[in-house]
Structures are given as structure tokens and as C-alpha cells.
Amino acid sequence: MRILVNISYDGLFFIGSQKQPEGRTIQGEFEKILSNLFKEDIKVIICSRLDSKVSAKNFVFVFDTENKSNISLEKIRRFLQDSFNTEVLIKTVIEVPPSFHPRHDVKYKIYSYKIQNTAFFDPLISSHLLVVFQPLNLKKIKQGIKLFEGLHDFSLFSSDSQEKNTKLIINKTWVKKTKDFISFYIIISICFKFLDYMARIWHRSFFLFYIRSLYVYK
């Protein structure tokens, strides 16, 4: 049987989502926990490869098991949740068709970045976002982020010089302001992928260019 698990996790506690020879990863941790539960070698297929320190709100993965002990889905969920502290939330555990694939069958992915735009910073959340003290010009930021929509060559936004296909499509971008926070959102279709470190370099470059060079302040 193939089982899908939907989680949210705090990226500060992991060096990434994909399994690495050393260090704590989402894929590596769940493979160890599930192998211990089912008493068989469990391999996890993750929906996306996220960088170190990147958090996820709806991150899914699947695994296959013979489940000879006939363990219920709710027991699996509780066992997984009890294996973590507060860095991971197990949202749902469901059975899916054997053909379901968490990367190939998803329609799109949404990437988000948040700025705390106030005269002070909150030390309880500042490690999870960018803090900008000067008032930002939201109108100019909205105009700037729209430049990334459509088909473009993003080779300068990748750390992999060997990547052959660097022309990608960003379907939609938008900016949302709520009180002291400004959030940026990027939507890409599953038929396209982000290059290595593209999302991280993309948003860093955007802020360096628009905040430092164009002075997008009020």
C-alpha cells in the first residue's frame, strides 16, 4: 500500500528536505522513524527538494509498505507526531493509489517570503523572515515583482553552472501587506522546476536591487 503524509515543519531544525550523508533532513528522519514502526526498510519520496533552513506549510511525501501488522492510519499519524517536538506537525495521513507520485501529480507549487517592515523587530519571529526598518514603497515593489512573470532565462539565479535548461516560466506573482508584514508569493506549474537555489537567490537579488539601488522607500 502507498501512504501519503502531509506535514508542516520549521526549516531551522533541518539542513533540507532531501536526505544527506550527514545532518538532519525531512526525508532521512521519516525514513528512520517509519522503518522502526513497520519493521521494514521504508523509502520516502518527497514532493520537493527544499534548501537548508527553508520551512514548509503543506509538504507531502509518500512511502510504500506491506503493513503486515495492519497498523491504522491514525496510529501512524500519532506515532509520527510523537517522534517530534514542535518542529514538525503531522497534518494528515491517508492511503493513495500506488501510481500516485508527490512530484509528478501536483498541479503547482507556491513559494512565499515574508518581510517584517516596522521600526523595530520581534526577536521571537525575526529568524524566520527578513526585517526592514525603513518604510517600503509597496506600489514600486508590486511593479518590480511582476517583471519576473512569464518565460525568462534564469541562469543567473542558479548555483548550478551545468544546468542545460535555464528558461523557466513563473506563472504568477503577487504581494500582500498585512499590518507590519509584507509577503511575496510565487506560483510555478509542476511541469517547470526551480533551478538549484533559484528561489533563494531570486528573492535576495530582488531585495538588493529594489531596496538598495532604487530605494523603494516612502
Give the location of each predicted region.
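Structured-RNA-binding interfaces characteristic of tRNA pseudouridine synthases
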Residues: 1-218
